[in-house]
């Protein structure tokens, strides 16, 4: 309402008289979005759906979503200052690489080489184990040393192919450029599938599956350049140093999926990437740059779609059901490199940071090296630890996996290795909820964490589901703002596991009863 907005404006550090009418209107829209009044917001969402502003117009509006948190400090939002100005450095080749056959969501890949085989750079060494799967390629040339379970960043032991590096980097005969323009869609998708390209943002969903399921359903492609996780700056540096790869991949995706609206969404704290991005997209009217408010989890798929298009992904559905397909910065880059060089997924840029790291950096070994390098090698390249780390993470501090060993390899979904000193790992024994409601305000999915936690502890699974337990994206916003320091996400993961186990048991019981009924019916028919 205008009266509420006037009161809100008085609290702002700028004077209303200094703002133009157009700026006033834009600020009002942002105010409505942050305060989430359903009736007021409908008009803003309708405007987003019905209009496709050009690049110059869209730059004036900052897009966001309701809820979320602001990790970091005023001087250092997101704790990114340690590495956001550090150029990508290439790491020396390791003596051996460890390549898990499961670096993606879906069925593990199946090894197609044997111990003692000589392999070349980019050679397929494991084939996809199903439709939702991805092949694995040799990231160095050399000899297969072992095929055995090795430690994975997820904490388990996974069948892995260990290759001893011969230092020659002989490219495999299958590595050659492809003519994207002359290929059919089926050939393009097969080319992406055979390259082992998966989501590089952490989810590692096979890219060819996302593309194939989205063709005909999606009218918008979004490149997720939010990189909202604290400390991580690998995507930021890629956009600064190799923006042509990401934009080239975005154009290919737009052609492949037949969409006329292709968005690259970047948080405001990466504004130094805007000039080059605008220059690269200026000649293609399908492409748009959308600045995003610096907020976590702005990069979560559902929140990003809502911020950019005003659409909401229905509960239990996929982004394609909202007409959108979302890809990571380096996923788009991997697609571009596949067609222009023929190289499959064999490298990864990783941010190394945290209070215990001597020299925080953004690291990438020369082509073919990072996938399979050990965590220990990566930290040593950053000068080791300036003090003993109390917490090691693969990924960001909000959604990453805690590590108990430095021997886990870099995999396709690894975007950071973080090491923190003891004073940053604060725990409370037997925390008690004070019912302040901060977790509800922070939840980007509009859930009720306060009740989800209670039902989870009581193992009241039906009520937990009714509160939206299975819609939780485990972003950690609720746990971050909790003054009692309750490990909410840990409880939610445990409860979701119980719900899934219950559903599987119910399905198995129903199938057994169905088979029993069919057998009884068949027996009666025989008796007749």
List the predicted regions and their residue ranges:
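N-terminal, Lys/Arg-enriched amphipathic/low-complexity engagement segments
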Residues: 58-112
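Short histidine-centered loop motifs in beta-beta connectors
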Residues: 109-118, 122
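Short hydrophobic beta/alpha edge segments that flank linear recognition/processing sites
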Residues: 119-133, 148, 159-165
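Conserved hydrophobic positions within beta-strands
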Residues: 142-144
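Acidic low-complexity segments
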Residues: 146, 151-205, 215, 271
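Hydrophobic alpha-helical positions that pack around
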Residues: 260-373, 381-386, 396
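Ferredoxin-type iron-sulfur electron-transfer modules in oxidoreductases and energy-metabolism complexes
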Residues: 414-430, 440, 444-523
